[in-house]
Amino acid sequence: MSKEKGIFLIDAVYEKNKESFIKKITGLVKKRRIIGYAGYSSRKDLEKNLLWQVFDENSPDKNFDFDKKKVKKIVKETLRKCLKEVNEKPYVFIFPSYSTFTKLKMGGVGGNFSKHNVMLIFVNTSAKMWEYSLKETLCHEFVHVVSPYYNPWENTIGERIVFEGIAENFQENVLKGRRSIFSKILKEKDCKEIFKKVVNKINSKNSKEHDRFFYGGKKYKRWTGYSLGYLLIKKYLKKNKNIGWISIIHKNPNKILEEIRKDL
């Protein structure tokens, strides 16, 4: 395991035995007084997360070269850019990812919030665009972990639309590059219609309803919630040109949503 000022790089050679492999990786994560086990209160909870984020017995890339030096360099450089906008330094735990979905659908990099100020990043360096995807994911998750309101287990669909929209716009602004795959699903003209479809679920905390709206299902295309959030917040930022990133990230998402709904 490699670490440097809140950046923890965890690596382990792939094993066919799922339980053994996950226990090996979680065994490399020490308990810390403020954040526990990478943001989780127990190793068991961390293991549950890593089982689907890291392990994939059908992965074609069980022996890819996890370039720790390059990964760390990208993480440090990207975080430096984020901190220029919002000076709240997070803990970052980086793991290799053997997930086929992460490689094929997410550019080789996935990430999630585990606790306020703690993010987990999962990297497959055999994916073609993994380096840029790593930058995108870091910027996106940075917004989530420094927000005083973000909690994926408690947030409503409406709050989540706002959070994902802020994260996507922040990422685009910081990297000054292309739009992410998540933001391209919808066009601006689609926003009103999609919002009407989901408005009766706007206060829902039901995880299945969240999954259908953000990750796709019969009614919605994959990444619909992300794309809707991106477009709505893009419009909101144009209208509120003087609002800075610190202000919008620390603003109650329900107040933002209320303002957005008036303009739809």
Summary of predicted features, one role per range:
Residues S2-L9, I157-K197:
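Post-HExxH zinc-binding segment in Zn-dependent metallohydrolases
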Residues F122-T137, G158:
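Short pre-active-site segment immediately N-terminal to the catalytic Zn-binding motif
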Residues V29-K30, N200-L264:
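Pan-zinc metallopeptidase signature
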Residues E136-Y149, E168:
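Active-site recognition of the HExxH zinc-binding catalytic motif
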Residues M1-K69:
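N-terminal low-structure segments adjacent to metalloprotease catalytic domains
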Residues S59-H116:
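Auxiliary, metal-adjacent structural segments of Zn-dependent hydrolase domains
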